[in-house]
C-alpha cells in the first residue's frame, strides 16, 4: 500500500516551471529517496506535500485519501534551511514547539528528555541555541521533527553539516524510525546516501521525474555504462555525480562534452 502519492503535480513560479506533471508513489513503512541536483524541484514538491504551498494542478493523496489540512499533524518536516530561534533557550524552545504539535507539557518534557539524553545534549537544555555548535543545533532540530511521532517524516538534506560519526549516528536513528513503522521521505543530491538507507527512489531533474523504482532494481538496470565524476562546484566545493554514458558515443567525445559543463577532477567507471 502506498502511504503517499502525487499524481501529475504541476507548479509554476513567475513563468518558471518548477514541477512538470510529477508523480511519485511512497510505499508505507519505507524510506523513499527523493534524489536530484539543487534546483531540480525537490523542495517545491516537499512544500506541496506539507501544504506550505498548493499545486497549480495535480493531486496529493495521503494515506489513501486526498490531502487535507488535518494531515499536516501527521507530518514531521526537517527543512534544509533550519529555522530555530537563536536567542531562545534550547529546552524552552523544544517544549514550545512540541506543544504546537499537540503534546501536553508533561509528555513533551518526558519525550524530549529521552531524546536529549540519547543524543548526549541534555547538559545544553538551559543554554541559548546560539551557544550550540551547528551539529548540536541540527540534533535539536531533528528531535523536534520526530518528537510527536508522526506517520510521515520528511528529511531534506539531514546530514548537511554533520561530521561522518554524527552523520552515521543519524542514519541509524532514521533506520530505527523506519523499523518502528514510520514512512520516511529522504531528499538529497547524494546518490551514495540513497543507496545506503533507501528502499525506493525517484530522481527529479529539470522539474520532471526521470527515473523511479526500487533502489536495487534501479542500480542493476543502470549499472552498465555508469561513471562516477568528481566535479568542482561554482562555490568551490567538490560534488560526486553518477552519470550514464549515452550509447554510440566514444569516451573521449563524451568526456569532451562533459568538460564543457563541469570542471572534472576525477572520472571512474
How does the language model describe each region?
Residues 105, 215, 248-251:
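Residues at or immediately preceding the N-termini of alpha-helices
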Residues 224-269:
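Short, charged/small-residue-rich alpha-helical element at the C-terminal edge
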Amino acid at each position: 500500500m502506498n502511504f503517499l502519492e502525487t499524481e501529475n503535480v504541476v507548479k509554476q513560479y513567475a513563468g518558471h516551471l518548477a514541477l512538470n506533471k510529477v508523480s511519485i508513489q511512497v510505499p508505507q513503512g519505507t524510506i523513499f529517496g527523493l534524489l536530484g541536483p539543487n534546483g531540480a524541484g525537490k523542495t517545491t514538491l516537499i512544500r506541496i506535500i506539507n501544504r506550505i504551498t498548493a499545486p497549480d494542478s495535480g493531486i496529493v493523496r495521503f494515506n489513501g485519501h486526498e490531502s487535507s489540512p488535518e494531515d499536516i499533524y501527521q507530518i514531521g518536516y526537517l527543512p534544509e534551511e533550519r529555522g530555530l530561534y537563536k536567542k531562545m533557550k534550547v529546552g524552552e524552545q523544544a517544549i514550545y514547539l512540541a506543544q504546537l504539535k499537540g503534546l501536553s507539557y508533561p509528555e513533551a518534557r518526558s519525550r524530549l528528555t529521552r531524546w536529549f539524553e540519547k543524543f548526549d545534549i541534555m547538559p545544553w537544555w538551559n543554554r541559548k541555541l546560539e551557544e550550540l555548535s551547528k551539529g548540536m543545533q541540527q540534533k535539536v532540530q531533528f528531535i523536534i521533527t520526530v518528537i510527536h511521532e508522526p506517520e510521515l517524516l520528511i528529511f531534506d538534506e539531514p546530514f548537511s553539516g554533520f561530521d561522518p560519526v554524527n552523520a552515521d549516528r543519524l542514519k541509524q536513528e532514521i533506520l530505527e524510525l523506519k523499523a518502528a513503522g514510520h514512512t520516511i521521505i529522504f531528499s538529497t543530491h547524494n546518490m551514495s546516501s540513497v543507496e545506503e538507507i533507501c528502499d525506493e527512489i525517484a530522481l527529479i531533474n529539470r522539474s520532471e521525474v526521470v527515473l523511479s523504482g526500487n533502489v536495487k532494481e534501479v542500480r542493476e538496470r543502470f549499472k552498465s555504462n555508469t561513471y562516477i565524476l568528481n566535479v568542482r562546484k561554482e562555490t568551490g566545493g567538490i560534488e560526486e555525480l553518477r552519470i550514464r554514458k549515452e550509447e554510440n558515443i566514444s569516451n573521449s567525445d563524451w568526456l569532451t562534452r562533459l568538460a564543457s559543463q563541469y570542471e572534472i577532477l576525477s572520472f571512474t567507471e
